[in-house]
Amino acid sequence: MLYQLSPSDLRRFYDDGYLIIEDLFSREEVEEMAEAAERIRALGREIAAALPADEEAGERKAEHGGSQFVFGGIDRSLGSTRLLRVVWAGGCEPSFLACGRDARLTAIVGQLLGSSTAVQLLNQLHAKYPNDGLEFEPHQDSEHRRYGTPEWCDVDGRGSYVQTVVAIDDTTPENGPLIFFPGSGRQGHLDPATVRNDYRDRPGIPALLEAGSAAFFGPYVVHRSAENRGAAPRRIAINGFALPGANSRSYFGAGTGVPVELFQPS
């Protein structure tokens, strides 16, 4: 059964910039992704072993099995090159793509976008392990969608994009949760440097998702995530969807976007 958003859900999404839906997937379903995430981590370690551990090298990318492994900095818990994210994670582990195409997820995206169709741009695994040092500064996703360049057009005037996060693990205040700044997106796209400076020291609201729960957010809400200082991993499956006509940038695995019927089973 597909989740039907209420008028208050829609208002919350556009006023606060994000929406939390609890228990969208079962723990058994996300356990499959947890096992896949550990296989991906093992692959990442093999690839990282061939890379020099260089704090100043910037991002380095390697393709394997239809996925792109992105490395950068040093994993302080291992002393080796750190895996930042896996792009198009469903290439080497299909359970990630199955999650991103599941109608329980995409139907909510469709209700938020007000559209039965979209193009999928992102299918990623982000994982933080205890004391690996990985954190993300305050930012808007509109920066990464290339807002203000010919590669992006806000066709509906409300962002034209929804990003989804499915928690693979229970999120705690200690293990590096997403932190949102409600209402921060009402002004639309902001200067990235200003966002980092203005929001770096603000507390924000942590999204303490239980495994199987999901966050949905637009491209303008400011958010960040802290370092994992807990004892357990914090792994999330990310999928991003744009309205047709919004994006012209090419993404690994998706090109300019894979067409998706949002209300139909994949």
Language model features with spans:
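Short, solvent-exposed loop/turn segments at secondary-structure junctions
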Residues: 26-27, 125-130, 143, 171-173, ...
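Non-heme Fe(II)-dependent double-stranded beta-helix
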Residues: 1-15, 22-149, 260-262
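Aromatic-acidic/polar surface patches that form glycan- and anion
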Residues: 26, 94-101, 157, 201, ...
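A structural signal for short, well-ordered beta-strand segments
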Residues: 122-125, 164-166, 237-241
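A structural signal for well-ordered alpha-helical segments within the folded catalytic domains
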Residues: 103-107, 162, 210, 215
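Non-heme Fe(II)/2-oxoglutarate
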Residues: 43, 51-54, 69, 190-194, ...
